């Protein structure tokens, strides 16, 4: 893999398309999307359900491969990387936040955040320090010992954000992170994601139909039926 650099874009997509199926049953989920994402940017990918938001995030994060076009992460063409390289990239360079919180119900907030580091073989002392810092970063330093059922929906999503941050990733992908939250809580989560981009120099890419969340991003990419419909 190429050497990482603090200069230049973190992600570049060129004429990326994704087609599922073939022949008469083929469905085009994305069509010729091009974009450049710089370090520390907060980008919102917006559109209605089925517009291609999740498909785009999957391509940009290396979870899926485009049918045509290229995606580069830190200068590396993802199509040329081995699966083991992609796994390593996602483990150390990328954090994921989803609509469903995905927390282990019998583990505390601290233990949930530590879990990826524990699986990766990090020492107890280092993973405890990192998890504590990540929980403090999302405003849950005093709730570290609480289990998910003792936390509100917004607090559970903050735990999932802390879990995404604990490996100190370069990019955080968030797929509909406010979809199960009320308006006030959703706004608070949006502010937290904005703070991540601003204070931790992580790039944040959010797929959302929540216009309030999108308004807090530095830039929007609007998708309509898999095509870039961004105005201006």
Residue locations for each model-derived region?
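ABC-family P-loop ATPase nucleotide-binding domain
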Residues: 1-19, 229-232
């Amino acid at each position: 893999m190429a050497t990482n650099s603090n200069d230049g874009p973190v992600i570049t997509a060129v004429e990326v398309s994704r087609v599922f199926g073939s022949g008469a049953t083929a469905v085009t989920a994305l069509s010729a999307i091009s974009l450049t994402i710089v370090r520390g940017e907060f980008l919102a990918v917006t559109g209605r359900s089925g517009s291609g938001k999740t498909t785009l995030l999957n391509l940009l994060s290396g979870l899926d491969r485009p049918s045509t076009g290229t995606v580069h992460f830190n200068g590396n063409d993802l199509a040329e990387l081995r699966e083991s390289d992609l796994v390593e990239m996602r483990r150390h360079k990328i954090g994921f936040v989803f609509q469903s919180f995905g927390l282990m119900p019998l583990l505390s907030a601290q233990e949930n955040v530590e879990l990826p580091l524990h699986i990766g073989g990090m020492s107890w002392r280092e993973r405890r320090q990192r998890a504590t810092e990540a929980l403090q970063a999302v405003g849950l330093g005093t709730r570290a010992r609480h289990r998910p059922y003792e936390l509100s929906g917004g607090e559970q999503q903050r735990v999932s954000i802390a879990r995404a941050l604990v490996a100190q990733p370069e990019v955080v992908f968030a797929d509909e992170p406010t979809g199960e939250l009320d308006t006030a809580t959703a706004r608070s989560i949006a502010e937290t994601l904005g703070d991540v981009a601003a204070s931790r120099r992580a790039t944040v890419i959010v797929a959302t139909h929540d216009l309030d969340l999108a308004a807090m991003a530095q830039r929007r990419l609007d998708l309509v039926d898999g095509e870039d419909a961004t105005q201006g």
